[in-house]
C-alpha cells in the first residue's frame, strides 16, 4: 500500500489509538513536520510526552496519550490561508468556537491559528485538532 501522507498516517494512528483507549502509540516513519505538529498538540494538552527514537532509518516516535483528544486530522491539499480567512476555516473545521485549533505552517514555523493571528502571519493549512 502506498503512503498518501506521512502526517496523515501519524494522525490516523493517534486517532485510532485514542479511540481504542491505548495509553501510548508508536508512529513510524518520523518527520520534522510530525514532530512540530505534536509539539503544538502537546502545548495545548491534547497529548502527553513524546519521544523520538533514532533507529538510523526514518526514525520512530512514541507518543503518550492522556485521553483528552477527540479528533485530529490533516487537510489535503494544503490550502493557502490569508489572515482574514482563518476565521472561515476554523468555523468549517472545528465543532464550536473557542474549542480546538487549526494548525498552520507559516514562514515563522508551525503554529495554531490563534498564535498565527497574534503574530500576524498567514500560511498553508496543515490540519486540525480538538
Swiss-Prot record:
The keyword Ribosomal protein applies. One of its GO terms (cellular component) is ribosome. GO terms for molecular function: structural constituent of ribosome. GO terms for biological process: translation. Keywords: Ribonucleoprotein, Ribosomal protein. Belongs to the universal ribosomal protein uS8 family. This is Small ribosomal subunit protein uS8. It comes from Candida glabrata (strain ATCC 2001 / BCRC 20586 / JCM 3761 / NBRC 0622 / NRRL Y-65 / CBS 138). The lineage of its organism: Eukaryota, Fungi, Dikarya, Ascomycota, Saccharomycotina.
Amino acid at each position: 500500500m502506498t503512503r498518501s501522507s506521512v502526517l496523515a498516517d501519524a494522525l490516523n494512528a493517534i486517532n485510532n489509538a485514542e479511540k481504542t483507549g491505548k495509553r501510548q502509540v508508536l508512529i513510524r516513519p518520523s518527520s520534522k513536520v510530525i514532530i512540530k505538529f505534536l509539539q503544538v498538540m502537546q502545548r495545548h494538552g491534547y497529548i502527553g510526552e513524546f519521544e523520538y527514537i533514532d533507529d538510523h532509518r526514518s526514525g520512530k516516535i512514541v507518543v503518550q496519550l492522556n485521553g483528552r483528544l477527540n479528533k485530529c486530522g490533516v487537510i489535503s491539499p494544503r490550502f493557502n490561508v490569508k489572515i482574514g480567512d482563518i476565521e472561515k476555516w476554523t468555523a468549517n473545521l472545528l465543532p464550536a468556537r473557542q474549542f480546538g485549533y487549526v494548525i498552520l505552517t507559516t514562514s515563522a514555523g508551525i503554529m495554531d491559528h490563534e498564535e498565527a493571528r497574534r503574530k500576524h502571519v498567514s500560511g498553508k493549512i496543515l490540519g486540525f485538532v480538538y
